[in-house]
Every structure is written in C-alpha cells, then in structure tokens.
Regions:
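Extreme N-terminal basic, low-complexity initiation segments
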Residues: 2-6
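Generic structural concept
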Residues: 417, 421, 448, 452, ...
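Short acidic alpha-helical/loop segments enriched in Asp/Glu that coordinate divalent cations
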Residues: 430-445, 467-473, 484-496
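Long, amphipathic alpha-helical stalk/connector segments used for oligomerization, subunit docking
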Residues: 403-407, 412, 430-439, 451-467
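Basic, alpha-helical terminal appendages of large translation-related enzymes
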Residues: 7, 12-13, 19-41, 85, ...
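N-terminal, positively charged nucleic-acid-binding surface of large information/translation enzymes
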Residues: 26-238
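Structured secondary-structure scaffolds
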Residues: 31-84, 136-139, 209-433, 470-474
Length: 587
C-alpha cells in the first residue's frame, strides 16, 4: 500500500505498567485451546454513549457484556485495560441545543456528567472514561488525519451540498430528511435509520428537506475532505475474514466491501466539533473523531497515571471493541482503514451485539419504545445486578434482545430468587444456625467436577463472546447445589450422622464460594454480599479460587436473602408505564 507511515515502532521501549492491570496469576489456555487469557496485553473499548440524552436499556447491551468480559479476563490474570468516553459532537447535539435554546457545550456537559455518575451505579468501572471534546481528542484527531494526508489517503474536492435558504445554513446529517437512495425508506442525511441502515454520504439523500423548517434546500458547492476508502479495499478483504469477534460484525462488513466501497466524506459544515485547521466553518465528521476518542481516553489515563498509551495502540497487544449492531459499518470499515493508514494497530476483534426491542417493537426513543435505566429502573429501587443478569442471560449476544417487564419478572423470580438465591440462602442459613462457622469436611469428587464443568463453560462463553453461556453456567451450578442439598438432607443427618451432615454443609459452602467467584463478573454486588456471609471481605478473587479449599472455622456472617421476589402488581405497573409512554408518543 502506497504511502506507508515511516514510524519507528520501538516495541521494546514500552515498560510494564506500574498500575495493577493484571489482577491474578495468568491461567494457562493451552490445554483445551482457549483464546483467553493471552500473553499479550488487551485493551477493551465500548462504543461511546452519545450525550444528547440519558442512559437507556439499549446502552446496556454493549456495556454490561463488555464489563463481564473484562472482569473475567482479570480473574484469569490477563493484563487488560478498559476504556470508554462520551461522544460529544455531531448534529444530534446541535439540533437538541437549538431546540432547547442553549449551546451544544451545555447539552454535552450535562449528559457527560450523567454518564460519569451513571456507570458506577450499574457496576461498570472503566480504567478511564473520557470525552471526545477533551483537548487530547481534538489534537489526536488532527494528528491522525494529518498522517493520513501525508500518506496520500486524504484529499479535498468541491461538493454540491444542500443549503437551506430559510435557515441560512448547510444541512449536514440530521439537519435534513428525505428518501434513502438504496431502499426508498425515510432517511436522515447520514443514515437510512428507518430502512436498510446504510451509511449515506452527503448529497446522496433523495428529495431532501430541512428537518428544522421543512424547506426544500438549494444545492451549493463547498470544499470538503475525503478519506480514500477505496485504497483500502484489498486490505479490508484480507483483514475482515481474519478479524475475531462476532459473525455479524465480520459478515456485515464483508457484504459492504463486496458491494463496492466509496471514498468517505470526513468533514461537515458545522461549528461544533473538531475544527479542520485553516478551514472556517468546517469540522471533522463525528465518526472521525468518535473512535479516535478511544485513543484519547487512553492518553487521558496515561497522563494521570504515568502509563504509556502507545504500549496499547502501537505495541504488542490486542484491541477489542464492543459495539452495538448499528455501528458495524463505522468500526469495521472506516476505523480499521484510518488506523492502518495512520500507522496504528488494527482491532483484533469487534464484538457486535444484536439489536434491542422493547415490548416486541424496534427500540425507538421518539416512538416511546424505550426504558430509561435510571428513571424507570434504578430510581424505583430495582436491583442493578438483576438487570445485569437479565442483559447477559436473556439471549445470545448476537440475537435481538426484546425487553419486556413480564420476562424480566419471570427471570428474577424463577432464576435469581427460585434457583440461585434459594440455594445460597438455604446453605448459608443452615450453616449459620447449626455451626456458626465453616465446618470441616472433604470436597466430594462429584461436587468438584460440577464446578470444573461450570468454569469450562464460562471459558467457552468468553472465547465465543456469548455471555448467556456464562450466566447459564452460573445458574446450572446453583441448580446442582439445590439438588445436592435436597438429596443429602443434612437436616436429618444432624440427628442420625452429625459428621456426615457437617461434610454435606462443607460441600454446600464450597459451592457457595465457587458461585461467589463465578458470578462476580455478572453480579458484582451480590458476589460481595456472599463473601460477607462467608465471613470474608473479598472482591475480584481469581478464577482459580473457585477450586481452592475453604478456610475451616471462619466465622460466618449473618445470612440474608440476596434477591427479592417481584410482585405481579409491580410488573403490571411497570408494563402500564411503558404502554402509556408509547401511547403518548403515538399521539
């Protein structure tokens, strides 16, 4: 490929970081061919939340699985860092700001702070959570585009674009609506959001109208910059089949490559965004600076801790992106091309999820098919760990998740209360009442085999990026615990064979400890509660701890149920809330 960056890599200059990015001894993955953990470092990112509104249920489809993945990697001794940040530029923010009579910066700052405070409430803790409006992101965006220019991958040309004479401005992206040239559906300026989902280049939209005033725009020529995406077609044909991750990411991207690539307009006529040096009223398109925000977030962390961001972006490691299924195009075509052309490492994996539905309908904020995580869930006192479990366990990661309150209630009541919580509370309560401490005993071979089976299923789930396999393994182990406890009947043995009863409870508490280890990445708050009831204040125990012996004679904490039954009346009330919202949106 012409114009390759002449940049010395200096891999050996990167020091091992002084912070604890590796939480336990590295577990071998050679015996059964597991992908993870890896000897090389891993950087995990999540698609940036767009800060024109609060967190909703569709956000969690990306962030919860990514957090589960990172937590398990750390349990296996993997060196891993986890980055995200707010996506702060683009027309959705400027349109909202105009509607509310405030500046785009006010909108951005309000919702950026919302997400900073929100993620810990749902148990998600990033190594760094940044912002694409941070000066580091402005600088890194300009540096990367400059590198692409130097290597012959960016050029400028005059382009006829829609201009609204009534509003006296060009109409980038969401400032116009019209007809998709590919499928004929109603579409916005940069994407067919109601039909085929295709990315639309400026000027492609048919029969455009100003989305603010409805005026039919004039076409006026103006200078814009383009990424020569066509120059990366051969690279993408080789890269995408080898890219790890979910099939929908690879297959969708390959389908678009097979259909023929076009050069990509990387600038917009706006004042809000990363300004193009030397060009008045021109900024880089939001999908240029947004993924660069992953790099800038790493730089923010490096400045704060004394780390080296290049260790992850130009070094020996693996880059893994977790994204929603609606942004595959950007992460599997534009982004690898930009990284390749500017001399950065390309992603090892792109993990794209299925879409989200609410009450059977395609997720839509404007049409009322939305669940606001704080207003509708957390503020009502509902359990954040139960929601994490629901997101992980509802279906396979690449299948559509259809959120409805009835299914949520059924999962909580049957699986969390009836199976997992039932075993844990029965085992801990019996032990506390009869012994007060962890009794002596030997772990039975059958019991140990069940835990080993659960660990293997979890590692398979990590390899395949299938988080339902992980939650199913936890639930299956709890179901086994219930069967074991019921079949051994220690309440009878305390009278007929006290020593055997003690051994049964020892095994039950050993299973309880294993569950605390294995469920922590899915339900960290509940795992911490189990450790306290086991008489320990542990967090982030390594995966190997699931198979380690109990500390006999440890004084047990006071047992308490982990989960609460959700009454049918509450489910009906929550379902009615969504129905009312939909009815109001539909007028």
């Amino acid at each position: 490929m012409a114009g390759k960056v002449q940049e010395e890599r200096k891999i050996n200059k990167f020091p091992r970081l002084t912070i604890n990015t590796r939480c336990s001894k590295l577990i071998s993955n050679s015996e059964k061919g597991h992908k993870f953990p890896k000897e090389k470092p891993i950087l995990v990112t999540c698609g940036l939340p767009y800060v024109n509104g609060p967190a909703h249920i569709a956000h969690l489809r990306t962030y919860v699985p990514a957090d589960i993945f990172v937590r398990f990697l750390r349990k296996m001794g993997q060196e891993v860092v986890f980055f995200c940040g707010s996506d702060t530029h683009g027309t959705p923010i400027t349109v909202k700001a105009e509607a509310e009579g405030v500046t785009p910066k006010k909108i951005m700052e309000k919702y950026h702070q919302h997400f900073v405070e929100f993620f810990p409430k749902i148990g998600i803790h990033f190594t760094n959570y940044g912002s694409t409006d941070h000066p580091l992101n402005h600088n890194r965006t300009i540096q990367i585009v400059d590198a692409l220019k130097e290597n012959g991958y960016v050029y400028s040309k005059m382009l006829a674009l829609p201009y609204c004479p009534t509003c006296d401005r060009f109409l980038p992206d969401r400032y116009q609506r019209g007809v998709c040239p590919h499928c004929g559906a109603s579409a916005r300026g940069d994407e067919c959001d109601q039909g085929c989902g295709r990315y639309l280049e400026p000027g492609e939209l048919m029969d455009p109208r100003c989305s603010i005033c409805g005026t039919k725009p004039e076409m006026i020529e103006t200078r814009h910059y383009f990424l020569k995406l066509t120059a990366f077609e051969e690279f993408l044909r080789e890269y995408l089949p080898a890219m790890d991750g979910t099939d929908i990411a690879r297959n969708y991207a390959l389908k678009w490559v097979e259909g023929g690539l076009k050069d990509w307009n990387i600038t917009r006529n706006l004042d809000w965004g990363v300004k193009v040096p030397g060009e008045e009223g021109l900024v880089y398109y939001v999908w240029v600076d947004a993924p660069i925000g992953y790099i800038a977030s790493t730089e923010e962390w490096a400045e704060r801790t004394g780390g080296d961001w290049e260790y992850y972006w130009k070094g020996p490691g693996h880059l893994i992106h977790f994204i929603g299924g609606d942004i595959v195009y950007h992460h599997c075509l534009f982004w690898p091309a930009m990284l390749k052309g500017a001399g950065y490492d390309t992603p090892y994996a792109v993990v794209a999820s299925g879409m989200v539905r609410v009450e059977g309908k395609i997720f839509s904020k404007s049409r009322g098919y939305v669940i606001w995580v704080e207003e509708d869930y957390l503020d009502r006192g509902l359990d954040p760990d139960a929601l994490r479990y629901y997101i992980a366990s509802y279906t396979g990661h690449t299948r559509d998740l259809d959120f409805n309150w009835s299914t949520y209630g059924e999962k909580v009541n049957k699986e969390l209360v009836g199976t997992l919580g039932n075993f844990l509370y029965r085992a801990l309560l019996f032990a506390h009442r009869n012994y007060g401490a962890i009794p002596e005993g030997e772990v039975e071979a059958e019991v140990r085999a069940e835990v080993e089976k659960a660990i293997e299923a979890i590692r398979d789930g990590l390899d395949e990026y299938q988080f339902k396999k992980i939650s199913d393994a936890v639930l299956a182990l709890a179901a086994y615990g219930n069967r074991y406890l019921q079949s051994r009947e220690p309440w009878k043995l305390t009278k007929t064979d006290p020593e055997k009863a003690q051994g049964v409870i020892h095994n039950c508490l050993w299973l309880t400890k294993a569950l605390a280890v294995l469920m922590e990445p899915v339900m960290p708050g509940k795992a911490a509660a189990i450790w306290r009831q086991l008489g320990q204040a542990r967090r982030d125990a390594p995966l190997s701890e699931a198979l380690e012996p109990l500390k006999v004679e440890t004084i047990l904490g006071k047992p308490a149920p982990l989960f609460e039954q959700i009454p049918e009346e509450t489910i009906e009330e929550l379902s009615e809330m969504v129905a009312k919202r939909i009815a109001e949106a539909e007028g």
